[in-house]
C-alpha cells in the first residue's frame, strides 16, 4: 500500500481522503482508464472529449503543436476529465519539448559540458515554466542514463555524460529547477539504466550488464540521489538487468529474464525495496519491440501491473487495451 503522506507526495489528511473517496466512487472502467497515458492523435474537440469521457485516461502525452494549440487542447481535456489529468511533455532540452514555439535551451550533454550544475537547474526551471504555462504538469525528464558505450543508439546527446557523479549532480539540479514551478513533477528515465548496450529497445531487447556492485555505484547512486530529493516518478525502460534480477530471484533462467517493465524483481525488489521509491512507476512506450517481443499484448498489460507498474505509455489501440 502506498503511503501518500510520505515522500514524494506528502499529502495531508484531507488530501488523502479526497484520493480515497475519488477511487471509491470510480467504476471498474474508470479505474482501468487511469492506468493509461494516451498519445493524443488529434486536437479536435470532439476527439478530446471522447478520449476522457469514454476511456477515462489518467494522462496524456500529445503530438507537437504551438503554445496556443497545446494550451487550448489541455484546457479542453482538464475541463472534461472527471479526475485531474497528468499532462506530460518531453522537456529534456527546453520548452520546445512542450510546444513547438517553446525555447530550445540545449541538450543535456551540452549542459553537462559546462561543468556547472546551475545551467542544469536553469534548464529544469525555464523549460518547465514554459511547459506549465501551456497546462503541462509532468516532464519525462531528466534523462538519468549514463553513456558508457558511444555506440548506444538511444541516449547519446540526451545524457549528462559518462561520469555517474556528474549525471547525479546535473539530474538533481534539473529536478530542483523543475520543482520551482508549483505543482510540477519529474519522471526520471530509463530505469534501470541505459547506456551500456549497442542495441535499441525500440527495436530489440536491451541489457544493462553491470554487476550489482557496479550498478550500485553508478545508476543506483543516480536514482538514489533523485529519490532522496523528492523525485515523483520513474519511467521504467524495456531493459534487462540480470545481476539484480537474479539477486532477488536466484532461480531465474535466461528465458525467464524480463525487462524492467515486466520484472517484479527490478520494480518491487530493487526500485521499491532497496531504493525505497514510493512514487509512480510508468512504462516507456508500450509499443516498443523491447516489450512487445516478450509476449502478446493481452498478457503484457497484466504482467506489467503484476510487476509493479502503475501506468502505461500508451494505448496500442483503445478498444483492444480496454
Please place each PLM-identified region on the residue numbering.
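Active-site mouth loops of central-metabolism enzymes
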Residues: 34-44, 108-122, 204-218, 287-295
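Glycine-rich anion/phosphate-binding loops
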Residues: 66-70, 113-129, 164-169, 213-216
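Short, acidic/polar
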Residues: 41-54, 120-130, 214-225, 295-301
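Acidic-leg catalytic submotif of subtilisin-like serine proteases
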Residues: 90, 127-139, 183
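Divalent metal-dependent hydrolysis catalytic cores, especially in the metallo-beta-lactamase
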Residues: 37, 52-62, 137-145, 308-312
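Second-shell residues forming the walls of enzyme active-site clefts
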Residues: 27, 70-79, 85, 95-97, ...
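N-terminal hydrophobic targeting/anchoring segments and the immediately downstream early-domain regions
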Residues: 1-106
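Short, conserved phosphate-binding/catalytic loop or strand-edge motifs used
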Residues: 144-154
